[in-house]
């Protein structure tokens, strides 16, 4: 019986070991967050490094942010980068929360949905116009986005509001920073601005 040369056996063994190491490193990179865990700063980043789900959300946000950056290349002023730095600071402040993990997860999901909607990175439905208070010129234009959680962008004149779907006993209710949109059977109750009264709006 003839056996392969010793050098061939040695080379094959080294190659198999190298490929195995590459798989291990590749898997580790795929499972970890987008940032270097060796340089993790603070308890929140350390938690992300040790949590597969949070690491996956971090990688997803990095991908979504990169795609948004391409869309925002002509944005003036260039606010996206500044906003992202502020978001990271806010995420890291989740250590102050009663439930830091829940706070961190929520921050990721809302930020991902926000960027996907604002920069039109996911399928959308609309726009739809709603006339409010029986005044044809008082119109709210709404576009819905297939994000998680679902979002909409409402426009009224030169003002824009991003809103997230909220639990509701009937209809679809979305809430933004100071605005809300509650639709039921083609009619909507809209609040636009802090402390302002409800507007009754009909779909155009």
Q: Which residues fall in each region the model found?
A:
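Compositionally biased, intrinsically disordered/low-complexity regions enriched for serine, proline
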Residues: 1-2, 30
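Bacterial N-terminal signal peptides that target proteins for export
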Residues: 2-14, 21
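N-terminal alpha-helical modules
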Residues: 28-204
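C-terminal segment of classical bacterial N-terminal signal peptides
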Residues: 17-27
């Amino acid at each position: 019986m003839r056996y392969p040369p010793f050098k061939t056996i040695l080379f094959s063994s080294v190659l198999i070991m190298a490929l195995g190491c590459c798989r291990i490193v590749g898997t580790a990179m795929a499972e970890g967050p987008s940032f270097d865990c060796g340089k993790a700063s603070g308890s929140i980043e350390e938690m992300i490094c040790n949590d597969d789900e949070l690491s996956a959300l971090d990688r997803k946000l990095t991908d979504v942010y990169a795609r948004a950056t391409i869309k925002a290349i002509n944005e003036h002023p260039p606010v996206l980068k500044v906003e992202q730095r502020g978001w990271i600071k806010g995420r890291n402040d989740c250590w102050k929360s009663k439930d830091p993990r829940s706070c961190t997860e929520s921050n990721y999901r809302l930020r991902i949905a926000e960027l996907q909607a604002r920069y039109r990175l996911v399928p959308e439905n609309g726009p739809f116009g709603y006339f409010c208070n029986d005044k044809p010129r008082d119109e709210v234009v709404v576009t819905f986005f297939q994000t998680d959680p679902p979002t909409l962008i409402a426009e009224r004149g030169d003002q824009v509001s991003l809103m997230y779907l909220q639990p509701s006993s009937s209809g679809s209710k979305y809430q933004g920073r100071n605005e809300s949109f509650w639709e039921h059977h083609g009619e909507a109750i809209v609040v636009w601005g802090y402390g302002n009264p409800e507007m009754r709006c009909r779909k155009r």
